[in-house]
A protein has these predicted regions:
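Non-catalytic, polymerase-adjacent accessory regions of viral genome-replication enzymes
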Residues: 1-48
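Active-site-proximal segment of RNA-dependent polymerases
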Residues: 5-9, 93-145, 149-152
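Reverse-transcriptase-like RNA-dependent polymerase core
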Residues: 15-18, 53-74, 87, 170-182
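Glycine-/proline-rich flexible loop or hinge segments
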Residues: 24-37, 69-79, 106-108
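Conserved phosphate/pyrophosphate-binding and hydrolysis machinery centered on Walker-type P-loop NTPases
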Residues: 36, 40-43, 111, 115, ...
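Conserved pre-motif C helix in the palm subdomain of viral-like polymerases
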Residues: 75-106, 185-213
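Conserved polymerase palm-domain catalytic core
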Residues: 128-223, 227-246, 250-256
Length: 257
């Protein structure tokens, strides 16, 4: 397990060295953008200004760039943050939120953290299907589910509770919640790294209930899509009832189609 010392301390997380590393990571692959080039031209001065604003409690968001994409057949509205804020969010996520929140994630939470992602989820589902076939042949069923308008309707309160219980200090909690509140009273932004980890974490208790309480070994979730494989249709009906109840408790809309 990763040593969590310093991951919950605001000043340690936002050291100049961490901010510089976050800057280097944030500009990879987007160096062609004019806004990125302007930021890079005075990178050290910009990082120093951000560092002082964070430690002085005066850091503010600069708003969003908005555009639309289609991802895995689903239209997505993106509200991308300014490069200076992307550096801060990268630093916050890499050196605090991701390691602190992901400690409690199930292995089969396949969303795009280090070593995970869409290909990981596909490999796991393929493995589940292979193992099920070896054990039961063609006898079995799959419950496929997804969360309706997940990023648009995600409720903040359960996310805030998870962040507050993660072991980080009050200033890190406040900054994390500030970034999420920038998107309004509900919903999470697809162009925000803090929102991404929040979206991954929000159904964590649902994952644990399906895996640990209902003991469904062949369960995989990739962000707002999930799959459960079982020999028993009745067991999957029990899983569906649990999903409906738990989603309602967490402010998540289960797609009933």
């Amino acid at each position: 397990a990763r040593n969590t010392k310093g991951l919950g301390d605001f000043e340690t997380v936002f050291s100049f060295e961490h901010l510089y590393a976050a800057y280097r990571a944030s500009v990879k692959g987007v160096g062609w953008k004019a806004s990125t080039q302007r930021y890079k031209a005075s990178a050290l001065a910009n990082i120093d200004k951000t560092h002082n604003a964070l430690l002085g409690g005066t850091f503010k968001s600069k708003g969003f760039y908005e555009f639309d994409i289609v991802e895995r057949g689903k239209p997505r509205h993106i509200r991308s943050v300014h490069i200076s804020e992307r550096v801060v969010q990268r630093c916050l996520c890499d050196y605090s939120l991701v390691p602190m929140l992901s400690r409690s994630f199930i292995y089969d939470n396949g969303a795009s953290l280090q070593g995970k992602g869409y290909d990981f989820a596909v490999r796991r589902v393929t493995r589940f299907l292979t193992k099920h076939y070896r054990q039961h042949g063609r006898e079995g069923y799959a419950l496929v589910f997804d969360f309706s308008k997940y990023f648009d309707t995600a409720q903040h309160a359960p996310v805030f509770r998870a962040i507050e219980k993660s072991g980080i200090d009050d200033r890190l909690v406040a900054l994390s919640e500030y970034f999420i509140k920038c998107f309004g009273d509900e919903g999470l932004g697809l162009g925000s790294q803090v929102s991404q980890i929040a979206a991954i974490a929000l159904p964590n208790k649902i994952d644990h209930y399906i895996k640990d309480v209902l003991r469904m070994k062949f369960y995989e979730r990739y962000m707002d899509d999930g799959l459960i494989i079982s020999r028993s249709k009745e067991k999957l009906r029990e899983c569906l009832a649990a999903l409906r109840r738990l989603c309602a408790e967490h402010g998540i809309k289960l797609n009933e189609k």
